[in-house]
From Swiss-Prot:
It holds the Pfam family YbaB_DNA_bd. SUPFAM superfamilies: YbaB-like. Binds to DNA and alters its conformation. May be involved in regulation of gene expression, nucleoid organization and DNA protection. The keyword Cytoplasm applies. This is Nucleoid-associated protein PMN2A_1347.
Length: 115
């Protein structure tokens, strides 16, 4: 059958073993990502947001001095902190997934280079 472009049995077995190993480690990785706390801040560090490694928002901290700046500045500071936390969280997840898969590109939704 190898003459028809199919992999030999040894290659197929090795591929299944690798997939099984990835699957076993994926659950552990999900648990690790869930308990991670990744901080994002705005430029002057007066707005902070923490997310898990799975991009779940965990908490927000606003410096009292920011509260006197007005609605638009507060909103921008929070948005900047959120973007920062999301960027670090997604890049951390991507790195950990690449470590898990040995660099094999999975092209998972939300894990691309676009932003």
């Amino acid at each position: 059958m190898a003459g028809f472009g199919l992999p030999n049995f040894g290659q197929l077995t090795e591929a299944f073993k690798k997939a099984q190993q990835i699957q076993q480690n994926a659950q552990k990785l999900q648990e690790e990502l869930e308990v991670m706390e990744i901080e994002g801040t705005n430029d002057d560090n007066r707005a902070k947001i923490w997310m898990s490694g799975n991009q779940k928002p965990l908490r927000v901290e606003i410096d009292p001095s920011l509260l006197s700046e007005g609605k638009a500045i507060i909103e921008e500071a929070i948005l900047d902190a959120m973007k920062s936390a999301h960027e670090v969280s997604t890049s951390t997840m991507k790195e950990r997934m690449e470590d898990l898969t040995g660099g094999f590109k999975l092209n998972l939704p939300g894990m691309g280079e676009e932003n």
